């Protein structure tokens, strides 16, 4: 058997060692500016004369003999001119502003024919029971296929393979190709990550692994891909990656996502996987001749470690938008990393040519699979949506449905009747609730708003509350985001990536689960959440409780405008003279001010942060409006000016022991007047080495992650919404000195709600050891620094939105705690 595949982490454990550079996330771009909206009823071809990017001789693809980004637009313009089968549209822009190209290959369609395809696609989703009864529907419907290329920028060859296949289909005179294009539409996202393609990096220009972002959608490239899948509703999709030798073809090992219609999914995905394997073997590559091992299918060939549990990856998100066959393919011959630097160009190009051939074979096999199973795949997609709309119980997949499917592969869930996102006093954050509603809608989950008060599941709700009826076609996606998740620690030892998440528990809003009963609620569908910003009409100073990231943005916006802000126990108070500015930010960020009255606090200035942080944390800090300068051991050693810094944030890439004498002296001087906030192992080590707070950090198992229960005392700097937080490589603190206060602790009755957290082989580092232990602590160093240490992951991949204010509050407190108390006028 092939060696067990090893997956590369993205924004994972390496976040504790590699500080984001100054080039990452320099600004938050308005990446969709100037991108035209798509007219889904236009006929085909849809010819677009793409603007030509400037030539870049440093494009990393050139060394491999592959097409540089600046060569793609002229190639696509030429293919559009050469026939009537190829259409190109710009679907968005990357973080750094590069166009994202969607290519559609299909037989020509008039506007009325395109409108008919849209009507059928809508029928399949919106009235699947009727679609299932329409025996003529498959013959009239072009089955959509989605090919996603180059989502990891330094896994290049999918783009070149896609362009090769597009040209073949565009120019072929084979009647079989004409028949294929008359019965399908093939959609190619030619390069999902142009920033990374040019730079030769896995991540995009903001430092994000895009293939970890699908249920967060923090990045514009992911939002574009998400919309393509919603708009096209593919029956099959493949996502082209590298590098695993032999070629890795999904389906995956357990654990399997519990919210899929897995009986339909595994039957089709395994069949297409076998077809791709055969096509790749037919190329004739061998270990002896080429260094290419035979393909491997994790479901068949591995026990665990390459799973489809979290919906953060493209092929694991696509089934919720209707794909009944969905795959990652990893071509075999590594050309990135040290190989890119050290191997001769001739060898790199030999490897890239093999990878391109293999990727092209996978694309051809997939469209052949859809051609041969056209009607059955459409029927299975209809069945996915029908089960959701009917509210049927989750089905347990029969053992042996495909060879090797055993008890270890069976994962199920129980769908509730509905979720309610309350309005009124029961809602801890109307701002967070609005963000969650908008996120659900952006994912094509149906949300309604109650027109009148109602009672459901034994609870009364006011008008304006939001309702997610789980009898809807995409109930799997709604549930995978809103359910608490599951503790899968007992079932597997190794996981591919994160194992626990929950928008309901981590995004700051109150979400109620309704398990049964009749749903007679006077409600109407919504396309966006209702506005939440307000300023009271009464005179006097205004108060804004900072419990959501949008409230942090509002405070930082006011500070940037020069508004005098007083900080008092988690509340920002602004004077009556700033009412107009408050009204502006209330509308801009959807935040609600209240009347302040008299309050005692400390003056808060614009908080300037030096951050030795991971790319996702740097992005999140800037998204919240903080003025952030990236630093690292090397930056400090080069001579750093601390005069413009209020707080040092440390989570990655700063080793106190490695600092030179001058850098250490400058840091010591800063600690007499500045604050420190740290996160994770690197942050805890910095605290110890710098002699800040008296505390012993204890490490949980390194790959442990998930949603955890926590407790926070009144007045905590780290109040946890609903009593939950998130961990990845968790830490806790023991041996606390008298200067240390516990701001947050892991639940004494066991912390893990959902995810994967086992003890290490020696029995240490498990969740039982963390019971009742300090997760977040604060205190004053004798030199003057106000310090906060996080053992949790409050900004992980920009995902746990409800936890961001904990970091902001720590930064505000750390910057302002030395100020004298004042009375707000």
Kindly label every feature range from the protein language model.
Residues 5-93, 99-104, 110-111, 116-156, ...:
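Intrinsic-disorder/low-complexity accessory segments
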Residues 140-148, 159-206:
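Short helix-loop-beta-strand segments that form the rim/entrance of peptidase-like active sites
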Residues 175-179, 210, 218-220:
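Histidine/cysteine- and/or acidic
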Residues 162-166, 222, 664, 807:
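Amphipathic alpha-helical segments in well-structured domains
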Residues 189, 196-203, 237-253, 276, ...:
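Core alpha/beta catalytic barrel or barrel-like domain that forms the active/cofactor pocket
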Residues 204-214:
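Short, charged loop segments at secondary-structure junctions
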Residues 1-3:
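Secretory targeting and sorting signals
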Residues 218-222, 227-282:
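Active-site-proximal loop/hinge segments that shape catalytic or ion-binding/gating pockets
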């Amino acid at each position: 058997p092939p060696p067990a595949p090893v997956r590369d982490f993205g924004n994972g454990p390496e976040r504790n060692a590699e500080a984001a550079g100054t080039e990452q996330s320099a600004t938050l771009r308005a990446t969709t500016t100037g991108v035209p909206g798509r007219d889904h009823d236009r006929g085909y071809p849809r010819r677009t004369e793409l603007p030509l990017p400037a030539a870049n001789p440093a494009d990393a693809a050139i060394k491999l003999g592959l097409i540089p980004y600046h060569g793609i637009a002229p190639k696509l313009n030429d293919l559009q001119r050469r026939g009537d089968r190829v259409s190109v549209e710009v679907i968005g822009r990357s973080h750094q502003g590069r166009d994202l190209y969607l290519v559609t290959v299909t037989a020509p369609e008039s506007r009325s024919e395109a409108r008919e395809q849209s009507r059928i696609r809508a029928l399949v989703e919106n009235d699947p029971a009727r679609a299932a009864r329409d025996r003529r529907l498959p013959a009239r419907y072009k089955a959509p296929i989605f090919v996603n290329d180059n989502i990891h920028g330094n896994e290049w060859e999918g783009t070149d393979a896609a362009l090769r296949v597009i040209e073949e289909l565009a120019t072929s005179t084979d009647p079989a190709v004409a028949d294929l294009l008359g019965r399908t539409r093939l959609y190619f996202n030619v390069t999902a990550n142009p920033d990374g393609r040019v730079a030769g990096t896995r991540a995009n220009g903001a430092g994000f692994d895009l293939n970890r972002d699908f249920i967060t959608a923090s990045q514009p490239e992911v939002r574009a891909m998400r919309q393509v899948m919603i708009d096209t509703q593919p029956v099959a999709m493949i996502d082209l990656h590298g590098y695993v030798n032999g070629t890795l073809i999904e389906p995956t090992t357990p654990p399997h996502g519990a919210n899929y219609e897995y009986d339909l999914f595994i039957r089709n995905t395994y069949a297409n996987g076998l077809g791709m394997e055969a096509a790749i073997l037919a190329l004739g590559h061998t270990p002896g001749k080429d260094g290419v091992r035979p393909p491997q299918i994790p479901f068949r060939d591995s026990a665990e470690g390459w799973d489809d549990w979290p919906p953060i990856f493209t092929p694991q998100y696509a089934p919720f938008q209707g794909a009944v066959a969905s795959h990652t393919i990893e071509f075999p011959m590594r050309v990135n990393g040290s190989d890119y630097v050290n191997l001769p160009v001739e060898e790199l190009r030999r490897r890239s040519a093999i990878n391109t051939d293999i990727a092209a074979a996978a694309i051809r096999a997939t469209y052949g699979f859809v051609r041969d199973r056209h009607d059955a795949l459409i029927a299975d997609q209809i069945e996915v949506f029908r089960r959701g709309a009917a509210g049927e119980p989750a089905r347990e997949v029969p053992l042996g449905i495909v060879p090797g499917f055993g008890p270890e592969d069976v994962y199920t869930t129980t769908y509730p009747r509905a979720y309610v996102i309350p309005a009124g006093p029961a809602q801890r954050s109307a701002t967070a609730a609005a963000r969650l509603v908008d996120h659900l809608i952006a994912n094509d989950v149906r949300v309604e708003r109650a027109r009148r008060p109602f009672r459901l599941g034994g609870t009364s709700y006011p008008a304006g509350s939001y309702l997610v009826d789980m009898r809807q076609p995409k109930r799997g996606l709604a549930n995978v985001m809103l359910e608490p998740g599951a503790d899968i620690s007992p079932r597997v030892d190794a996981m591919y990536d994160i194992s626990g998440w929950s928008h309901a528990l981590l995004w700051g809003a109150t979400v109620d689960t309704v398990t049964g009963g009749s749903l007679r609620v006077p409600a109407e569908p919504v396309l966006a959440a209702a506005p939440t910003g307000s300023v009271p009409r009464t005179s006097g100073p205004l108060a804004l409780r900072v419990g959501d990231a949008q409230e942090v943005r509002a405070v930082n916006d006011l500070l940037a405008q020069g508004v005098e802000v007083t900080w008092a126990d988690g509340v920002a108070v602004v004077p009556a003279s700033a009412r107009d500015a408050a009204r502006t930010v209330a509308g801009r960020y959807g935040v609600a001010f209240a009347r302040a009255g008299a309050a005692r606090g400390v003056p808060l200035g614009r908080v300037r942060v030096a951050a030795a942080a991971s790319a996702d944390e740097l992005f999140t800090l800037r998204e919240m409006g903080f003025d952030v300068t990236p630093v690292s051991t090397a930056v400090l050693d080069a001579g750093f000016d601390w005069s413009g810094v209020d707080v040092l944030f440390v989570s990655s890439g700063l080793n106190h022991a490695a600092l030179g004498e001058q850098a250490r002296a400058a840091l010591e001087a800063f600690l007499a007047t500045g604050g420190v906030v740290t996160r994770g192992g690197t942050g805890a080590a910095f605290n110890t080495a710098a002699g800040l707070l008296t505390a012993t950090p204890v490490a949980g198992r390194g790959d442990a992650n998930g949603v955890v229960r926590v407790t926070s005392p009144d007045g905590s700097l780290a109040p946890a919404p609903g009593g939950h937080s998130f961990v990845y490589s968790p830490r806790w603190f023991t041996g606390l000195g008298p200067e240390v206060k516990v701001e947050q602790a892991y639940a004494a009755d066991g912390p893990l709600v959902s995810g994967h957290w086992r003890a290490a082989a020696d029995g240490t580092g498990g969740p039982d050891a963390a019971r009742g232990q300090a997760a977040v602590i604060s205190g004053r160093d004798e030199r003057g620094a106000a310090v906060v240490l996080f053992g949790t992951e409050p900004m992980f991949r920009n995902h746990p939105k409800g936890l961001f204010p904990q970091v902001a509050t720590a930064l505000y407190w750390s910057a302002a705690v030395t100020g004298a108390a004042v009375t707000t006028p």
